Amino acid sequence: MRTILVASSKGGAGKSTLSTNLAAHFAVEGKHTVLVDADKQHSATRWCEKRAHLNTAVLPIDGTARNWQKHIPENTQVIVIDAPAGAMGDDLDAYIEMADAVLVPVLPSMIDIEATVPFLNSMAKNARVKKKKLPVGLVGNRLKPWTNASQQAVEQLKSWPYSVVGELRDTQAYVLMVALGKSVFDYNSEQLRSHQEDWVPILKWLKKVI
């Protein structure tokens, strides 16, 4: 069983979008996938409910409930945890202890980047992170590669002690897919294949570290 925690202290960074598409990827691969929704908005749960009829359904579990771990089926192969919005390192201890890797989405603006620093500093106090026994990867999200702002943001992220493991472009495709309970991995159109390619570095990193 592999567990991936998706966390960010900054609201609107794309945490749930990253979580749902990641869960869909593993489900499309044929793996028994659970999405632990620890965000009080429960947008990830609603996404799971919309695809419950599919062969690639993802089982939602309420991560805000007491003893939520007991609801994880024994045949689960992959767990994706959508962390609570605005949570700092100390608030994530229960999820961090389960995680095999952590993904942190960051938007391409100095305000968002600066807001992420205290979060990463708080996570660094965790014993597993401090001892480098828990891999942490940054994901540049909603990037517009043709703009100076996005290019500068990526360069700034690369100067941090954590690896930039992926760069996801700004596109309405994610908004449309989430509304349908789908992901960019559920279709084989040429347009969506280009978005799938954006995920290759993230998936390669996860395969390497867990």
Residue ranges and their predicted role:
Residues L18, P118, A173:
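Residue-level recognition of oxygen-bearing side chains
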Residues T3-S9, A13, T20-E97, V178-F185:
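P-loop/Walker-type NTP enzyme "switch/lid" segment
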Residues P84-G166, D170:
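Conserved catalytic-core segment of NTP-binding enzymes
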Residues G11-G12, Q41, M110, K144, ...:
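Surface-exposed, flexible loop/turn segments at secondary-structure boundaries
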Residues K144-I210:
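Conserved GTP-binding G-domain of TRAFAC-class P-loop NTPases and closely related GTPase folds
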